[in-house]
Amino acid sequence: MRMLLHLSLLALGASYMYAIPTEIPTSALVKETLTLLSTHRTLLIGNETLRIPVPVHKHHQLCTEEIFQGIGTLESQTLQGGTVERLFKNLSLIKKYIDGQKKKCGEERRRVNQFLDYLQEFLGVMNTEWIIES
């Protein structure tokens, strides 16, 4: 009986893995998620009493933890089912992608020259893509 339970759980896990498309390019996943968000915006706004913290500044890449905490709050307060479930599944996949990318932020020591090149690129992005507040 116990072996049957283990095999059932293994089969369930395997079917779950194959049910989630892992080969979708992230850009396509983000586009689909934006479409789903637009489609379900009215449903998601339904709870007018719910308050979710929103980061003050516009540098979204610095606030991923806060954004995903807000998504978790919204998900826990939203009735699941249908395509809204797909929205939250996509957001979960995007979070996994971002978490994987964050792991690339460290762990490798390089020469000072390589660090300075990276720093210069970082400051260039800040200069062109960020809204710098006075």
UniProtKB/Swiss-Prot annotation:
Keyword Cytoplasm among UniProt keywords: no
Subcellular location: Secreted
Cleavable signal peptide: 1-19
GO MF: cytokine activity; growth factor activity; interleukin-5 receptor binding
GO biological processes: immune response
Superkingdom, natural source: Eukaryota
Keywords annotated in UniProt: Cytokine, Disulfide bond, Glycoprotein, Growth factor, Secreted, Signal
One term under GO cellular component: extracellular space
Entry-listed glycosylation sites: T22, N47, N90
InterPro entries: 4_helix_cytokine-like_core, IL-5
Pfam families: IL5
Primary role: Homodimeric cytokine expressed predominantly by T-lymphocytes and NK cells that plays an important role in the survival, differentiation, and chemotaxis of eosinophils. Also acts on activated and resting B-cells to induce immunoglobulin production, growth, and differentiation. Mechanistically, exerts its biological effects through a receptor composed of IL5RA subunit and the cytokine receptor common subunit beta/CSF2RB.
Subunit structure, interactors included: Homodimer; disulfide-linked. Interacts with IL5RA. Interacts with CSF2RB.
Protein name in UniProt: Interleukin-5
The encoding gene: IL5
